[in-house]
Amino acid sequence: MVMNHIQISEHELKTEVFTPEVVNYLLEMTRKFRERRDQLLQERQTRQTLFNTGSRPDFLPETSEIRDSSWIVAEPPADLNDRRVEITGPVDRKMMINALNSGAKVFMADFEDSTSPTWNNIVRGQINVRDAVYQNLSLTQDGKDYNLKEKTATLMVRPRGWHLPENHIIIDGSPAPASLIDFGLTVFHTAEAALARESGCYFYLPKLESHLE
């Protein structure tokens, strides 16, 4: 059984976030990518040892084409064409509503530095991101109602860094990579709705240390 290979800490919203389909998805994704992720983290240490002994970083011959002045990239999605005003903040429900209503072009919901990675914050943060994409993110607090405007900032999500574990999800005996959990839950719960709105799941990947990562 899947649950023999994955243990997820209890939470009052656990069954809403971690459906059987989600659990299978997270298990398969972690098994596919965790070994490579661990190798890349080890390569960080190897590079640091080289730098500590006097080696200096340089450009790789195999990536020379991207430094050619003729090199171009594809156009960004339409709703990311204008990022002149972009704000970021935690995945708290009230703060997300205010940020999405702020008039900024892009709001980056940050599971990393802006959010204390308690289990409650992570689980509720995923609910909040899902509700934002489905445009039903709302809150009543201290007698005041908070709702999304008709036009909101484009939503981007910043998952936690490669190096961070999610100790509340144990897969095959080890904590799951937090980055894969944040990414996987967001894609599973929001991709279909985002595409239906002619948008997409947009991610800011923090603290990468090489092009391989």
Identify what each model region corresponds to:
Residues 3-28, 32, 57-69, 77, ...:
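Conserved alpha/beta-domain cores
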Residues 91-94, 114:
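Short acidic loop-to-helix transition motifs that present clustered carboxylates
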Residues 34-68:
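An N-cap/entry alpha-helix motif that binds or orients negatively charged groups
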Residues 51, 108-124, 205-208:
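Glycine-rich, proline-tolerant flexible connector loops at the mouths of alpha/beta enzymes
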Residues 72:
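Conserved mixed alpha/beta core segments that line enzyme active sites in large multi-domain catalysts
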Residues 125-138:
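Acidic, Ser/Thr-rich peripheral helices and adjacent loops at domain boundaries
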